[in-house]
Amino acid sequence: MSIENTDVHPEGYDDYVTFLKRRIRQLELQVRTLEADKERLERELSRLRMEMSRLRQPPAFAGNVIEVLDDERAIVQNYNGPRFVVRIAPWIERDKLKPGARVALDQRTMAIVELLPSEKDPSVLGFEVIERPKVTYNDIGGLEKQLQELREAIELPLKHPELFEQVGIEPPKGVLLYGPPGCGKTLMAKAVANHVNATFIRVVGSELVRKFIGEGARLVHELFELAKEKAPTIIFIDEIDAIGAKRMDETTGGEREVNRTLMQLLAEMDGFDPRGNVKVIAATNRPDILDPALLRPGRFDRLIEVPLPDYQGRLEILKVHTRKMNLKGVDLRVIAEITEGASGADLKAIATEAGMFAIRDRRTYVTQDDFLKAVDKVIGSEKRLAQQIAMHEVMYG
């Protein structure tokens, strides 16, 4: 870089010195700027050289860690291939190298050179996962007997496994809740998860049905892997009849894929410790169509019926859903009496509708008349719909 020549000199010696000093400062600033650019470009060049070096490396094998022998050696398996005792590269973080971890293996030496992220289907990550549900036993009315049985099967093994060891029995691996829709099966499962400080994973059976061969089975496997990672965990499979129906000898391609998914579920349940930190609860309103293999001991070996609530149950449910409502002159016993055949979900809808009637009339309290109109709207509309369906079937078959 050269200093610009100028034909016009400042008048006087002092002015010329000042001019030169200013020019020197400008050039020094330019030098510092160029040096900074040089350092930046050298760093970029170094990064690109490293990137080129990595790109020239031969591809690595992907595998799984079977067992970590010591700080320098581990047993690995290259997917469905033979097992090898291999070296562990010194830069690998030992605390993250655990059985089941996915790793990259050097093509020539089979040494572990990189830890890979866990492989999970996006569908698994899309399941409803609640670290700790907010539902408590006080939020459930009319199911004291069923809650007691569920707590014995799920809560006791997680909180007091030593009791089963002392008695010498194995706790149930899974619990099947069966009964009409809207009777509190999901709420019961969430309440148990809350009281044992467990992660709650809810999946609907139909979400495990996949189009392509093996996808459903892989999804089930990854569901249980996710549960083990977040243990203690309660897996709640709603509408399990979607994958757990009785198997037939003659099946179509789609039915065979559903059967593969069921077989994977059975294998997963057979493969974990009943005294471990993963419990399975399933729900269905069609227990009659379930495959007998699901219900044998060691799988869903505790069956709990969750029926429609009786009068006392309906009264307890109404108390739960109205405890935060501003009631005036409401006799819940009358409402419980006239709602025979209603489910817990129906009773919750009745309480909500009664509140809506009060809001519609610009009131801050709910009356008995609001509840009577709500009963007619919720229960009456269901009966009218059932009558219309029955009439349609009679007329059109």
From Swiss-Prot:
The keyword Oxidoreductase does not apply. SMART domains: AAA. Keywords: ATP-binding, Chaperone, Coiled coil, Cytoplasm, Nucleotide-binding, Proteasome. One of its GO terms (molecular function) is ATP hydrolysis activity. It is found in: Cytoplasm. It holds the Pfam family AAA_lid_3. Residues 15-58 form a coiled coil. Gene3D superfamilies: 1.10.8.60, Nucleic acid-binding proteins, P-loop containing nucleotide triphosphate hydrolases. Residues 395-397 are annotated as: Docks into pockets in the proteasome alpha-ring to cause gate opening. GO terms for biological process: proteasome-mediated ubiquitin-dependent protein catabolic process; protein unfolding. One of its GO terms (cellular component) is proteasome-activating nucleotidase complex. ATP binds at residues 182-187, 321. InterPro entries: 26S_Proteasome_ATPase, AAA+_ATPase, AAA_lid_3, ATPase_AAA_core, ATPase_AAA_CS, NA-bd_OB-fold, Nucleotidase_PAN, P-loop_NTPase. Homohexamer. The hexameric complex has a two-ring architecture resembling a top hat that caps the 20S proteasome core at one or both ends. Upon ATP-binding, the C-terminus of PAN interacts with the alpha-rings of the proteasome core by binding to the intersubunit pockets. Belongs to the AAA ATPase family. ATPase which is responsible for recognizing, binding, unfolding and translocation of substrate proteins into the archaeal 20S proteasome core particle. Is essential for opening the gate of the 20S proteasome via an interaction with its C-terminus, thereby allowing substrate entry and access to the site of proteolysis. Thus, the C-termini of the proteasomal ATPase function like a 'key in a lock' to induce gate opening and therefore regulate proteolysis. Consists of three main regions, an N-terminal coiled-coil domain that may assist in substrate recognition, an interdomain involved in PAN hexamerization, and a C-terminal ATPase domain of the AAA type. This is Proteasome-activating nucleotidase.
